[in-house]
Design a protein with these regions (language model features):
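Basic-flanked hydrophobic alpha-helices used for secretion and membrane insertion
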Residues: 61-65, 106-195
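Short extracytoplasmic
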Residues: 23-43
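The feature marks short, hydrophobic/small-residue-biased sequence motifs that occur predominantly
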Residues: 56-62, 66-116
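Short secondary-structure boundary/capping segments
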Residues: 14-16, 98-100, 185
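Short acidic amphipathic segments
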Residues: 41-56
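Alpha-helical transmembrane segments
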Residues: 1-22
């Protein structure tokens, strides 16, 4: 794994910012997720400081990741989530950041703080080895995806780390395909924008 942020701050182009909706107590109590309406997105896109606007697309299916061999005590399984942003906002090697429709391997960009949490919190308390960024790129990941209509198992590979964005990113093409196939009865709402 090559840390793409070594050229600057991260894999993202430096002129972009992430905008999120405020979480309100009333939404929490009602079980609602804060999201931008179409009118809010249209209004935001007309602001003079916005040249381009993209939406974060959340997975409409459950994600479980298995790393290593949990049965042999050499790995673990965890719940995860995926989000996607339009590829034009990702300043990464496109030969690594691509997904072929119908493919069986998902390239992933992880937040660097997740690796730090694993190394300095989880691994140290569980007697597991610390992992470098390069090592994570060599680790075999199995993703188990469970939607409302279908399930799927896929391989995964970490292709970069980010210091600037706090989500688990997958290519937009994969997200569109997986949401449509696994949970066609659900429609993703944008809780964050990239501008």
């Amino acid at each position: 794994v090559i840390p793409f942020f070594s050229r600057g701050d991260s894999f993202m182009k430096e002129t972009y910012a992430v905008v999120g909706k405020r979480v309100l107590v009333s939404q929490t109590l009602a079980g609602d997720t804060p999201s931008f309406t179409s009118a809010e997105i249209a209004d935001f896109s007309k602001q003079p400081f916005v040249r381009r606007l993209g939406k974060f697309t959340p997975a409409q299916f459950d994600v479980f990741a298995s790393i290593g061999n949990a049965q042999a005590g050499l790995g673990f399984t965890t719940d995860m989530f995926f989000e996607a942003i339009p590829d034009r906002y990702v300043d990464a090697d496109l030969s690594k950041w691509n997904y072929r429709l119908g493919g069986d391997t998902i390239p992933v960009i992880l937040p660097k703080n997740y690796l730090n949490l694993y190394n300095f919190g989880f691994a140290s308390t569980k007697g597991l080895p610390a992992l470098s960024e390069a090592m994570v790129g060599m680790v075999q990941i199995r993703f188990y995806l469970r939607g409302t209509q279908q399930n799927r198992q896929m391989a995964g590979r970490v292709v970069a780390f980010s210091d600037r964005i706090n989500t688990i990113l997958v290519p937009q093409a994969f997200m569109n395909e997986a949401n449509a196939a696994l949970s066609p009865d659900r429609h993703p709402l944008a809780s964050r924008l990239i501008v």
